[in-house]
């Protein structure tokens, strides 16, 4: 199966061959609401026996809630896209500007804990099969070409403004491809008369590590340049909006011996002078921390690390 690659996202080719027998009974594109708890396999029809055309969600004011739709098709679909309407309840409206759509994209992985020994440490790759698994929610790619005999998830997220009136809201998600409407799914949202505080007031201590070097490598831009920060802003805002409290700062070259695909470089420049004294330049560190704080992540800075795994010090 060919990889689905756009200028925004490079998807790996599927190492699992498509079994035509599984698609024999699928004679036309199928669209249904699915479950946010299921990672649908790319090479198999979705395990949905009766298409669900209506989704019922319940949320508080100020909450973000999501649903997943699924498209599976025996033929190529060009320019697949999802279009949402406003959600209305009488004269009250949740604007479609508060609704975000995205394609559920696939990443390559291997069998997890096949031998029962855990997932850390060296493993002989020949002993573990590789496959694609649904993981990334791609909000950037506007349309996608879906190959024949393949399945694609679509992620729909609704941000309910805190000032929203309680009630039952209804709207639609229209699935289009090749310039025509394939299906119109109904979305029902019951907004309760309770209000979730803004993320800045949440007590939960959310700490998801950030790697700005991965973004600069992926987009081939100078680390911590204006272009780099512009690219990171919508990405890191997702973390801030989820209630992120901690800034990840690497203050040493490869603190974990480069175990990640994109190594963490030092945000602090270490200089040892001829007279034996030390000078530390915090320019990059300051830029990064100020950037994250401006987005609302400001409770803690985790600095890695005074002693690196490899016991190798670069200066």
Label each region the model flagged.
Residues 1-2:
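Hydrophobic h-region of N-terminal signal peptides that target proteins for export
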Residues 5-51, 74-156:
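Surface-exposed binding patches on compact interaction domains or structured appendages
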Residues 52-75, 153, 233, 248:
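Contiguous beta-strand segments within globular domains
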Residues 61-65, 72-78, 161-165, 180, ...:
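Short, solvent-exposed loop/edge-beta patches enriched in aromatic
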Residues 159, 170-177, 185-315:
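Aromatic-lined carbohydrate-binding surfaces of glycoside hydrolases
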């Amino acid at each position: 199966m060919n990889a689905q690659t756009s200028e925004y996202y490079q998807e790996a080719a599927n190492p699992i061959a498509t079994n035509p027998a599984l698609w024999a009974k699928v004679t036309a594109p199928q669209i249904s609401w699915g479950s946010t708890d299921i990672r649908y396999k790319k090479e198999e029809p979705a395990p949905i026996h009766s298409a669900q055309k209506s989704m019922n969600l319940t949320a508080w004011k100020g909450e973000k809630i999501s649903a997943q739709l699924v498209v599976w098709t025996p033929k190529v679909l060009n320019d697949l896209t999802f279009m949402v309407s406003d959600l209305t309840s009488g004269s009250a409206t949740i604007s479609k500007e508060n609704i975000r759509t995205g394609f559920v994209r696939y990443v390559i992985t291997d069998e997890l804990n096949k031998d029962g020994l855990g997932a850390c440490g060296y493993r002989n790759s020949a002993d573990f099969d590789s496959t694609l698994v649904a993981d990334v929610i791609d909000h950037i790619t506007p349309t996608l070409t879906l190959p024949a005999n393949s399945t694609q998830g679509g992620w729909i997220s609704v941000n309910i403004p805190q000032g929203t009136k309680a009630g039952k809201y209804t709207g639609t998600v229209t699935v289009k491809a090749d310039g025509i409407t394939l299906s119109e799914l109904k979305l029902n949202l019951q907004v309760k008369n309770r209000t979730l505080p803004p993320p800045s007031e949440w007590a939960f201590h959310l700490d998801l590590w950030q790697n700005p070097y991965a973004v600069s490598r992926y987009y081939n831009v100078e680390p911590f340049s204006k272009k780099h920060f512009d690219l990171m802003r919508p990405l890191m805002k997702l973390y801030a909006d989820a209630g992120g409290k901690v800034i990840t700062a690497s203050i040493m070259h490869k603190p974990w011996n480069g175990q990640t695909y994109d190594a963490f470089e030092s945000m602090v420049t270490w200089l040892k002078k001829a007279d034996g004294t030390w000078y530390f330049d915090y320019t990059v560190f300051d830029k990064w921390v100020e950037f994250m704080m401006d987005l609302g992540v400001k409770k803690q800075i985790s600095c890695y690390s005074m002693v690196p795994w490899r016991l190798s010090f670069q200066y």
